[in-house]
Protein backbone atom coordinates (compact mmCIF):
# COMPACT_ATOMS: atom_id res chain seq x y z
CA UNK A 1 0.00 0.00 0.00
CA UNK A 2 1.48 3.35 -1.05
CA UNK A 3 1.84 6.12 1.48
CA UNK A 4 -0.83 8.81 1.54
CA UNK A 5 0.53 12.30 0.90
CA UNK A 6 -0.40 14.82 3.59
CA UNK A 7 0.56 18.49 3.26
CA UNK A 8 1.13 20.80 6.24
CA UNK A 9 2.54 24.31 5.60
CA UNK A 10 5.96 25.37 6.84
CA UNK A 11 5.12 29.09 6.43
CA UNK A 12 5.99 31.11 9.55
CA UNK A 13 2.36 32.17 10.06
CA UNK A 14 1.23 28.53 9.96
CA UNK A 15 4.07 27.57 12.30
CA UNK A 16 3.00 30.33 14.70
CA UNK A 17 -0.46 28.74 14.70
CA UNK A 18 0.96 25.32 15.59
CA UNK A 19 1.75 23.66 12.24
CA UNK A 20 4.93 22.02 13.54
CA UNK A 21 3.06 20.51 16.48
CA UNK A 22 0.34 19.23 14.15
CA UNK A 23 2.95 17.66 11.85
CA UNK A 24 4.69 15.96 14.78
CA UNK A 25 1.37 14.68 16.18
CA UNK A 26 0.36 13.28 12.78
CA UNK A 27 3.65 11.46 12.32
CA UNK A 28 3.57 10.03 15.83
CA UNK A 29 -0.07 8.91 15.65
CA UNK A 30 0.33 7.35 12.20
CA UNK A 31 3.46 5.50 13.32
CA UNK A 32 1.61 4.15 16.35
CA UNK A 33 -1.27 2.95 14.16
CA UNK A 34 0.97 1.58 11.43
CA UNK A 35 -0.41 3.97 8.80
CA UNK A 36 1.76 4.80 5.79
CA UNK A 37 1.96 8.58 5.41
CA UNK A 38 4.26 10.82 3.40
CA UNK A 39 4.30 14.15 5.22
CA UNK A 40 5.19 17.08 2.96
CA UNK A 41 5.79 20.60 4.29
CA UNK A 42 4.39 22.86 1.61
CA UNK A 43 4.09 26.62 1.34
CA UNK A 44 0.95 28.36 2.56
CA UNK A 45 -2.05 29.25 0.42
CA UNK A 46 -2.55 32.38 2.51
CA UNK A 47 -5.74 31.13 4.18
CA UNK A 48 -4.47 32.05 7.61
CA UNK A 49 -7.86 31.78 9.31
CA UNK A 50 -7.67 28.04 8.49
CA UNK A 51 -4.08 27.50 9.62
CA UNK A 52 -2.78 25.02 10.39
CA UNK A 53 -4.36 23.81 7.14
CA UNK A 54 -3.91 20.08 6.57
CA UNK A 55 -4.38 18.82 3.01
CA UNK A 56 -4.74 15.16 2.06
CA UNK A 57 -4.07 13.97 -1.48
CA UNK A 58 -6.96 11.90 -2.84
CA UNK A 59 -7.94 10.65 -6.28
CA UNK A 60 -10.23 13.67 -6.63
CA UNK A 61 -7.61 16.19 -5.50
CA UNK A 62 -6.43 17.68 -2.24
CA UNK A 63 -8.99 17.71 0.58
CA UNK A 64 -8.59 20.44 3.21
CA UNK A 65 -9.01 20.36 6.98
CA UNK A 66 -8.51 23.34 9.25
CA UNK A 67 -7.76 24.94 11.52
CA UNK A 68 -6.30 21.74 12.94
CA UNK A 69 -4.73 21.43 16.39
CA UNK A 70 -2.39 18.65 17.44
CA UNK A 71 -5.10 17.33 19.76
CA UNK A 72 -7.45 16.90 16.77
CA UNK A 73 -5.25 14.35 14.98
CA UNK A 74 -6.53 11.13 16.66
CA UNK A 75 -10.18 12.01 16.00
CA UNK A 76 -9.41 13.06 12.43
CA UNK A 77 -7.68 9.74 11.75
CA UNK A 78 -10.60 7.88 13.33
CA UNK A 79 -12.95 9.72 10.97
CA UNK A 80 -10.92 8.79 7.88
CA UNK A 81 -8.57 11.73 7.40
CA UNK A 82 -6.28 9.76 5.09
CA UNK A 83 -9.21 8.96 2.81
CA UNK A 84 -10.41 12.57 2.70
CA UNK A 85 -13.54 11.69 4.66
CA UNK A 86 -16.00 14.33 5.94
CA UNK A 87 -15.32 15.92 9.32
CA UNK A 88 -16.37 19.04 11.20
CA UNK A 89 -12.96 20.55 10.33
CA UNK A 90 -13.22 19.47 6.69
CA UNK A 91 -13.73 21.90 3.81
CA UNK A 92 -13.78 19.59 0.81
CA UNK A 93 -11.45 20.09 -2.14
CA UNK A 94 -9.07 23.00 -1.60
CA UNK A 95 -9.60 24.40 -5.10
CA UNK A 96 -13.34 24.65 -4.42
CA UNK A 97 -13.00 26.77 -1.29
CA UNK A 98 -15.02 29.96 -1.95
CA UNK A 99 -12.00 32.19 -1.27
CA UNK A 100 -9.89 30.38 -3.88
CA UNK A 101 -12.43 29.21 -6.44
CA UNK A 102 -12.74 32.54 -8.29
CA UNK A 103 -9.09 33.53 -8.06
CA UNK A 104 -6.59 33.40 -10.88
CA UNK A 105 -3.29 33.39 -9.05
CA UNK A 106 -0.20 34.63 -10.86
CA UNK A 107 2.59 35.52 -8.45
CA UNK A 108 0.98 33.16 -5.93
CA UNK A 109 0.36 30.38 -8.48
CA UNK A 110 2.54 27.85 -6.64
CA UNK A 111 1.63 28.95 -3.12
CA UNK A 112 0.37 26.02 -1.08
CA UNK A 113 1.09 23.59 -3.89
CA UNK A 114 4.86 23.16 -3.87
CA UNK A 115 7.54 22.70 -1.25
CA UNK A 116 9.53 25.95 -1.06
CA UNK A 117 13.00 24.40 -1.22
CA UNK A 118 12.28 21.62 -3.72
CA UNK A 119 13.94 22.32 -7.05
CA UNK A 120 12.05 19.37 -8.54
CA UNK A 121 8.70 20.76 -7.38
CA UNK A 122 9.52 24.20 -8.75
CA UNK A 123 10.54 22.88 -12.15
CA UNK A 124 7.52 20.57 -12.33
CA UNK A 125 5.27 23.61 -11.94
CA UNK A 126 6.80 25.78 -14.65
CA UNK A 127 9.93 26.92 -12.86
CA UNK A 128 13.01 28.04 -14.83
CA UNK A 129 11.09 28.07 -18.13
CA UNK A 130 11.25 31.87 -18.22
CA UNK A 131 14.98 31.92 -17.51
CA UNK A 132 15.72 29.33 -20.19
CA UNK A 133 13.75 31.35 -22.72
CA UNK A 134 15.43 34.60 -21.66
CA UNK A 135 18.83 33.00 -22.26
CA UNK A 136 17.82 32.54 -25.91
CA UNK A 137 16.99 36.25 -26.32
CA UNK A 138 19.10 39.38 -26.51
CA UNK A 139 18.91 41.81 -23.58
CA UNK A 140 17.00 44.28 -25.78
CA UNK A 141 14.48 41.57 -26.68
CA UNK A 142 13.95 40.65 -23.02
CA UNK A 143 13.22 44.28 -22.13
CA UNK A 144 10.87 44.61 -25.09
CA UNK A 145 8.90 41.54 -24.01
CA UNK A 146 8.45 43.02 -20.54
CA UNK A 147 7.36 46.34 -22.08
CA UNK A 148 4.92 44.62 -24.43
CA UNK A 149 3.47 42.57 -21.58
CA UNK A 150 2.66 45.72 -19.61
CA UNK A 151 4.16 44.17 -16.49
CA UNK A 152 4.06 46.48 -13.48
CA UNK A 153 5.57 46.29 -10.04
CA UNK A 154 3.47 45.21 -7.07
CA UNK A 155 4.48 48.44 -5.37
CA UNK A 156 5.95 51.72 -6.59
CA UNK A 157 2.59 53.06 -7.80
CA UNK A 158 2.44 50.33 -10.47
CA UNK A 159 5.43 51.75 -12.34
CA UNK A 160 6.04 49.81 -15.61
CA UNK A 161 8.81 47.27 -15.01
CA UNK A 162 9.96 47.44 -18.63
CA UNK A 163 10.61 51.18 -18.42
CA UNK A 164 12.74 50.67 -15.33
CA UNK A 165 14.67 47.80 -16.94
CA UNK A 166 15.23 49.78 -20.14
CA UNK A 167 16.54 52.75 -18.17
CA UNK A 168 19.06 50.58 -16.31
CA UNK A 169 20.07 48.74 -19.49
CA UNK A 170 20.83 52.03 -21.24
CA UNK A 171 22.72 53.52 -18.29
CA UNK A 172 26.50 53.57 -18.47
CA UNK A 173 28.37 51.60 -15.84
CA UNK A 174 30.91 48.81 -15.54
CA UNK A 175 29.05 47.11 -12.67
CA UNK A 176 25.28 47.01 -12.36
CA UNK A 177 23.15 45.49 -9.62
CA UNK A 178 19.66 44.06 -9.19
CA UNK A 179 18.20 44.74 -5.75
CA UNK A 180 15.04 43.19 -4.35
CA UNK A 181 13.47 45.44 -1.74
CA UNK A 182 11.84 42.95 0.65
CA UNK A 183 11.95 45.29 3.63
CA UNK A 184 8.12 45.38 3.62
CA UNK A 185 7.78 48.05 6.30
CA UNK A 186 4.03 48.65 6.01
CA UNK A 187 2.20 47.17 9.00
CA UNK A 188 0.20 44.05 8.23
CA UNK A 189 1.64 43.63 4.74
CA UNK A 190 3.00 40.13 4.28
CA UNK A 191 2.92 39.47 0.53
CA UNK A 192 6.71 39.77 0.30
CA UNK A 193 7.18 37.44 3.25
CA UNK A 194 4.92 34.82 1.67
CA UNK A 195 6.88 34.98 -1.58
CA UNK A 196 10.25 34.75 0.15
CA UNK A 197 9.20 31.81 2.30
CA UNK A 198 6.85 30.08 -0.12
CA UNK A 199 8.33 30.47 -3.61
CA UNK A 200 11.95 31.64 -3.28
CA UNK A 201 13.08 30.16 -6.60
CA UNK A 202 10.56 32.36 -8.41
CA UNK A 203 12.29 35.43 -6.98
CA UNK A 204 15.71 34.04 -7.88
CA UNK A 205 14.58 33.32 -11.43
CA UNK A 206 13.02 36.76 -11.87
CA UNK A 207 16.08 38.58 -10.57
CA UNK A 208 18.34 36.52 -12.83
CA UNK A 209 16.22 37.40 -15.86
CA UNK A 210 16.38 41.06 -14.85
CA UNK A 211 20.15 40.76 -14.58
CA UNK A 212 20.37 39.34 -18.10
CA UNK A 213 18.19 42.16 -19.40
CA UNK A 214 20.14 45.06 -17.91
CA UNK A 215 23.66 43.63 -17.83
CA UNK A 216 23.89 43.11 -14.06
CA UNK A 217 25.96 40.27 -12.63
CA UNK A 218 25.26 40.79 -8.92
CA UNK A 219 22.03 40.95 -6.98
CA UNK A 220 20.96 41.59 -3.40
CA UNK A 221 17.80 40.50 -1.60
CA UNK A 222 17.21 43.03 1.17
CA UNK A 223 15.07 41.35 3.86
CA UNK A 224 14.02 42.84 7.16
CA UNK A 225 15.60 41.10 10.15
CA UNK A 226 12.13 40.58 11.66
CA UNK A 227 11.66 37.87 9.00
CA UNK A 228 14.16 35.23 10.23
CA UNK A 229 12.35 32.39 8.46
CA UNK A 230 12.34 34.29 5.18
CA UNK A 231 16.06 35.00 5.56
CA UNK A 232 16.78 31.32 6.24
CA UNK A 233 14.66 30.03 3.34
CA UNK A 234 16.05 32.56 0.88
CA UNK A 235 19.63 31.81 1.91
CA UNK A 236 19.08 28.06 1.43
CA UNK A 237 17.31 28.60 -1.90
CA UNK A 238 20.20 30.68 -3.25
CA UNK A 239 22.65 27.95 -2.25
CA UNK A 240 20.53 25.26 -3.93
CA UNK A 241 20.09 27.32 -7.11
CA UNK A 242 23.83 27.93 -7.28
CA UNK A 243 24.57 24.24 -6.75
CA UNK A 244 22.15 23.36 -9.58
CA UNK A 245 23.73 25.87 -11.96
CA UNK A 246 20.94 28.46 -12.02
CA UNK A 247 23.22 31.00 -10.31
CA UNK A 248 26.95 31.57 -10.46
CA UNK A 249 29.60 32.33 -13.05
CA UNK A 250 27.94 30.27 -15.81
CA UNK A 251 24.14 30.38 -15.49
CA UNK A 252 22.69 27.25 -17.11
CA UNK A 253 25.89 26.87 -19.13
CA UNK A 254 25.20 30.12 -20.98
CA UNK A 255 28.40 31.94 -20.16
CA UNK A 256 26.39 34.63 -18.34
CA UNK A 257 27.18 35.31 -14.69
CA UNK A 258 24.74 36.25 -11.95
CA UNK A 259 25.14 35.85 -8.20
CA UNK A 260 22.78 36.66 -5.34
CA UNK A 261 23.30 37.59 -1.72
CA UNK A 262 20.88 38.14 1.17
CA UNK A 263 21.30 41.32 3.19
CA UNK A 264 19.39 41.72 6.46
CA UNK A 265 17.72 45.03 7.20
CA UNK A 266 17.74 46.60 10.65
CA UNK A 267 13.99 47.15 10.62
CA UNK A 268 13.96 50.90 9.94
CA UNK A 269 10.78 51.95 8.14
CA UNK A 270 12.67 54.50 6.04
CA UNK A 271 14.74 51.72 4.45
CA UNK A 272 11.69 50.79 2.42
CA UNK A 273 12.62 53.86 0.33
CA UNK A 274 15.00 52.79 -2.42
CA UNK A 275 17.92 55.12 -1.78
CA UNK A 276 17.81 54.57 1.99
CA UNK A 277 17.82 50.84 1.27
CA UNK A 278 20.94 51.21 -0.90
CA UNK A 279 22.66 53.17 1.87
CA UNK A 280 21.87 50.34 4.28
CA UNK A 281 23.13 47.66 1.87
CA UNK A 282 26.40 49.59 1.60
CA UNK A 283 26.76 49.44 5.38
CA UNK A 284 25.81 53.06 6.01
CA UNK A 285 23.00 54.58 8.04
CA UNK A 286 19.68 54.15 6.25
CA UNK A 287 18.78 57.70 5.23
CA UNK A 288 17.22 59.00 2.03
CA UNK A 289 19.68 60.30 -0.56
CA UNK A 290 19.25 63.59 -2.34
CA UNK A 291 17.91 63.10 -5.88
CA UNK A 292 18.93 63.13 -8.68
CA UNK A 293 20.58 60.81 -9.47
CA UNK A 294 17.90 58.14 -9.26
CA UNK A 295 18.88 54.49 -8.78
Residue ranges and their predicted role:
Residues 1-295:
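Feature of Fe-S/electron-transfer and energy-metabolism proteins
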Amino acid sequence: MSAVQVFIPCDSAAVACGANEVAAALQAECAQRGLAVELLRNSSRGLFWLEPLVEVQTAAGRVAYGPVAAADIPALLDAGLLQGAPHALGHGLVEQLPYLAKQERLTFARMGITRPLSLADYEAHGGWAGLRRALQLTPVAIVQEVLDAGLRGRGGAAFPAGVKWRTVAQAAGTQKYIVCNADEGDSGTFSDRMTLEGDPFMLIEGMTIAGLAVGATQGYVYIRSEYPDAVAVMTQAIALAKQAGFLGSDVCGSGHAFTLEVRKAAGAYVCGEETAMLESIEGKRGIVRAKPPLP
